Regions:
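Short loop/helix-cap segments at secondary-structure boundaries that form the rim of catalytic
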Residues: 36-41, 51-52, 72-75, 89-95, ...
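Rossmann-fold dinucleotide-binding core
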Residues: 82-156
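Conserved small/polar residues in nucleotide/adenosyl-binding loops
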Residues: 161-170
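NAD(P)+-binding Rossmann beta1-loop-alpha1 motif at the extreme N-terminus of oxidoreductases
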Residues: 1-46
């Protein structure tokens, strides 16, 4: 069973906690959030320096904060991924193994989602870690697609525009 820690409590982090909590094959180890003090589903910590060991750390913060947050993770040689569609994995500190776990979806905390319909774009520095991210996607019943940074950079604005357009037209 893969142990996962989510870092960040914005829209994406909130929904990833739901996704991983609902999986019988993933152990949601903890949720690091500056703004949430308690969640009955998972241990919540407020300081990144207090993280416990997990197999994967998923950084789900603003693009401009990814590097700073990854620098604060005290462990070495762990798989650390971010959820950004427009940031390369090499923005993560290289003391850890690096990758991307990017859900191709616009998120809102007030929106209920069918998580199993959300495609996950994955990328990793090594083939071994890519296999781990494939397993992580499969274990939460999501389809995954191997997409590198250049492809993701092109896909991100197109998908963002498409996914945020109204789905009904008023005549």
């Amino acid at each position: 069973m893969i142990k996962v820690t989510i870092i960040g409590s914005g829209n994406v982090g909130f929904h990833l906690v739901n996704l991983f909590h609902n999986s019988t094959k993933i152990k949601l180890n903890e949720w690091c959030s500056r703004s949430i003090d308690f969640d009955e589903r998972v241990k919540v910590i407020n300081e990144i320096e207090n993280l416990s060991e997990s197999d994967i750390y998923v950084i789900s913060v603003s693009d401009k904060s990814i590097t700073e947050v990854s620098d604060k993770i005290q462990f070495k040689n762990k798989l650390v991924v971010h959820t950004s569609g427009s940031t390369p994995y090499n923005s993560l500190n290289n003391k850890n193994r690096r990758g991307v776990f990017y859900p191709l979806q616009t998120f809102s905390k007030s929106q209920e989602l069918n998580y199993y319909e959300i495609p996950i774009c994955i990328e990793a520095e090594s083939d071994k870690d890519l296999e781990i991210l494939k397993k992580l996607s499969t274990d939460v019943n999501c389809k995954h697609y191997e997409i590198n940074f250049e492809e993701r950079k092109t896909l991100h604005p197109v998908s963002y525009t498409h996914l945020t357009l109204p789905t009904t037209r008023h005549v």
